[in-house]
Amino acid sequence: MIDNYNRNINYLRISVTDRCNLRCVYCMPPEGVKQTPHSEILSLEEFARVVDAASDIGIRKIRITGGEPLVRKNIVNLFEKISTNSAIDDISLTTNGVLFAEMASDLKKAGLNRVNFSLDSLNPDTFRDITRMGKFNDVWRSIQKALELELHPVKLNVVAVRGINDHEFADFARLTKEIPIHVRFIELMPIGECNPWAVGNFIAAEEILHGLQQKFGLLDTQVKVTGSGPAKYYCLPNSKGTIGFITAISEHFCAGCNRLRLTANGQLRPCLYGKQEFDLKTPLREGASRQELAKIITKAIRHKPSQHHMEDGWRDRRVMSQIGG
């Protein structure tokens, strides 16, 4: 469906839970956050109903996120349900990778096409400092499993944090020469309770790119990678993978935004950084028809803003795991 700014909205990101088995320093406080009661979170069947309605108005790509989506009980069943919808041509997953290896084969059989891993360090000790949990070896095993199953393109999402992992950017770049992996450096976003901390540790993508070019020389920009995202991709000479940058803060990509976000408790957000939400949980539980749900989704698309205004300050106290990354 085309919105008011001539953007084709064809991509729905679904947060299936606000729970997570890690406690990343930029995402939530050490004690975690107040969890949404299970009764308030949509069932897998309700998520599938939303997908069916959304597909009627042009949604073609689905990404399952969290929290950590793989902690959701019976999550494989949701992939199976979505894959039966012939209008959906791409089903992807964003995960921290802790549980992925043991579920990977079942997920692929259920319809998973590709996977993104959140991995902010290649050093187990630094990884533990960032996640407050560790389990680096589990994550690395999951990445290897995704490559083995050819869930291409396999992407690594690296949140760039000054003083934490900025000394590892070259190591991530070298990784793309060794294996067919696509590393994306993501600018730290000032979201939720971690807002002041994030502002002080921000690194612009341009600074990262400049540092890599000083080390490796000019990077090739004639690169395309499968996906619906906003990353700009580069590659090192003779590399098997690519290096990408997601510049949500320094150079927003709102003009090309093609997505909606559905929170675990059934609120549809036209913009991740906006305040407006459209309630789908209530009509779902009141027996709304597929057509009625599609009308609500259409309304949300009509209200999608031209761009975010995060530079004016983040006023939502919820953290990313609660909204859906």
From Swiss-Prot:
Keyword Transmembrane helix in annotation: no
Details of cofactor binding: Binds 2 [4Fe-4S] clusters. Binds 1 [4Fe-4S] cluster coordinated with 3 cysteines and an exchangeable S-adenosyl-L-methionine and 1 [4Fe-4S] cluster coordinated with 3 cysteines and the GTP-derived substrate.
InterPro entries, sorted: Aldolase_TIM, Elp3/MiaA/NifB-like_rSAM, MoaA, MoaA_NifB_PqqE_Fe-S-bd_CS, MoaA_twitch, MoCo_biosynth_MoaA/MoaC, rSAM
Enzyme class, broadest EC rank: lyase
GO MF terms held by the record: 4 iron, 4 sulfur cluster binding; cyclic pyranopterin monophosphate synthase activity; GTP 3',8'-cyclase activity; GTP binding; metal ion binding; S-adenosyl-L-methionine binding
Chain residues that bind GTP: 13, 63, 94, 155, 259-261
The Radical SAM core domain, residue ranges: 4-219
Record: residues binding S-adenosyl-L-methionine: 26, 67, 118, 189
One Pfam family it belongs to: Radical_SAM
Family: Belongs to the radical SAM superfamily. MoaA family.
Role played: Catalyzes the cyclization of GTP to (8S)-3',8-cyclo-7,8-dihydroguanosine 5'-triphosphate.
Protein name stated in the entry: GTP 3',8-cyclase
Originating species: Desulforamulus reducens (strain ATCC BAA-1160 / DSM 100696 / MI-1) (Desulfotomaculum reducens)
